[in-house]
Amino acid sequence: KEGYLLGSRG
């Protein structure tokens, strides 16, 4: 999901 803007977790 939006993990790419947090550090690639989603």
UniProtKB/Swiss-Prot annotation:
MF GO annotations: toxin activity
GO cellular component, one term: extracellular region
Tissue/organ expression: Expressed by the venom gland.
Superkingdom of origin organism: Eukaryota
Main localization category: secreted
Cell compartment(s), UniProt: Secreted
UniProtKB keywords: Secreted, Toxin
Record protein name field: Toxin To61
Organism: Tityus obscurus (Amazonian scorpion)
